[in-house]
A protein has these predicted regions:
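Short, small/polar-rich loop/turn modules that mediate ligand/substrate recognition or access, typified
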Residues: 171, 176, 242-244
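Short C-terminal tail/terminal secondary-structure segment
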Residues: 144, 232, 243-258
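Catalytic loop of short-chain dehydrogenase/reductase
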Residues: 135-159, 163-172, 184-185
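Substrate-binding pocket helix/loop in short-chain dehydrogenase/reductase
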Residues: 95-97, 103-108, 212
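Alpha-helical segment proximal to the catalytic Tyr-Lys
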Residues: 124, 168-169, 240
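A short, exposed helix-loop element centered on a Lys and neighboring polar residues
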Residues: 119-120, 164
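Conserved glycine-rich cofactor-binding loop
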Residues: 14-18
Length: 258
């Protein structure tokens, strides 16, 4: 299927690895020019080189997008994107009793205020041009809270609520805003949390990994490639009637019908 977005321009945040990289790869395969950002120059430039093999224009921007200066640098590199993929690593796990006001501020800054600032900077240009696709990568915690991830639960749910009305307004101009709610995907973050769980229990990493996979009805973790394919479709010309939705991709893990 031709997604109809060849020649479009996209910003993909946190795209040097993991789910962000999967999204950038999927868009590049469809002929989309991509501006990618991350804080680590080495990994970002390596990803940019890989993406360039698709024949599209790839612009890497080394920055901390959670800062105003970082967002300014990113938007200077691509001031008029047709596609915006908001993505950020989640806040650290912990216990509610131990979280400080500063912990909450950082969580909200990184996972709510930053994507909202990028949306505010780009959505109105998209509306004027008559095409835009915004995808917020959040978390399965939007559907069901995840223990020990209260910081992420709160900040990501805040973002989801904040864009709900805008999604209904922007769609009249062929601009959609949707959320993708990933469950367990084979990423550095998941491997890191699995390692910590194994260390805390003093068991082998393979034991915890097997337990986590067994808890997923699909019997495995998701891949960044299949995640990116879903995001690319939501960015396509065929998805203009899908907006304000939050799509859970978790291998069947959510135990509800709705």
């Amino acid at each position: 299927m031709d997604l109809g977005i060849r020649g479009k321009k996209a910003i993909v945040c946190a795209a040097s690895k993991g789910l962000g990289k999967g999204c950038a790869e999927a868009l590049a395969r469809e002929g989309v020019d991509v501006t990618i950002c991350a804080r680590g120059a080495e990994a970002l430039n390596a990803t940019a080189k890989e993406l360039g093999a698709s024949g599209v224009k790839v612009t890497p921007v080394v920055c901390d997008v959670t800062t105003e200066a970082g967002r300014k640098a990113l938007l200077a590199a691509c001031p008029d994107p047709d596609i915006l993929i908001n993505n950020a690593g989640g806040p650290p796990p912990g216990d509610f009793k131990d979280f400080s006001s500063e912990d909450w501020r950082k969580a909200v800054e990184g996972n709510m205020i930053t994507p909202l600032a990028l949306i505010h900077a780009t959505v109105y240009g998209m509306m004027q041009r008559g095409f835009g696709r915004i995808v917020n990568i959040t978390s399965a915690s939007i559907k069901h809270p995840i223990a020990a991830l209260e910081l992420s639960n709160g900040a990501r749910l805040g973002l989801t609520g904040a864009v709900a009305v805008l999604a209904r307004k922007a769609c009249k101009s062929n601009v959609t805003i949707n959320g993708i709610l990933p469950g367990p995907f084979d990423t550095d973050r998941l491997r890191g949390t699995t390692q910590k769980m194994a260390e805390a229990r003093k068991v082998a990493l393979s034991v915890v990994e097997a337990e986590r996979k067994a808890a997923v009805p699909a019997g495995r973790f998701g891949s960044a490639e299949e995640f990116g394919a879903v995001v690319a479709f939501l960015c396509s010309t065929h998805a203009g009637y899908i907006t304000g939705q939050n799509l859970l991709i978790d291998g069947g893990g959510y135990p509800g019908s709705l």
